[in-house]
Amino acid sequence: MGFYMLLTVALLLTSLMNVEATPVDQAERSALEKSGLGNRIQPRYDNCGDAEADCYQSKCMDEETYDEECEASCNYVVANCISD
């Protein structure tokens, strides 16, 4: 039993030593938004034109190719660009 514990710890330490961190400047860091259970990269939009262009592209109109980028742009459009 002790052998397996030692083996597990050794494997964990080995895997942690192989992880390389890449530096991220503040501009890139602020472009990432925390969403849901983890971090997803979501573009931030400064105006409705860019968000609408992304939301209304053909890949976002197809249920099979709709992805997180489509969701982020369409959520921005709904929240900020559509007036009643």
From Swiss-Prot:
One of its GO terms (cellular component) is extracellular region. The keyword Signal applies. Expressed by the venom duct. It is found in: Secreted. It comes from Gemmula speciosa (Splendid gem-turris). This is Turripeptide IX-03. Keywords: Disulfide bond, Neurotoxin, Secreted, Signal, Toxin. Residues 1-21 form the signal peptide. It comes from the Eukaryota. Residues 22-39 form a propeptide. Disulfide bonds join C48-C70, C55-C74, C60-C81. GO terms for molecular function: toxin activity. The cysteine framework is IX (C-C-C-C-C-C).
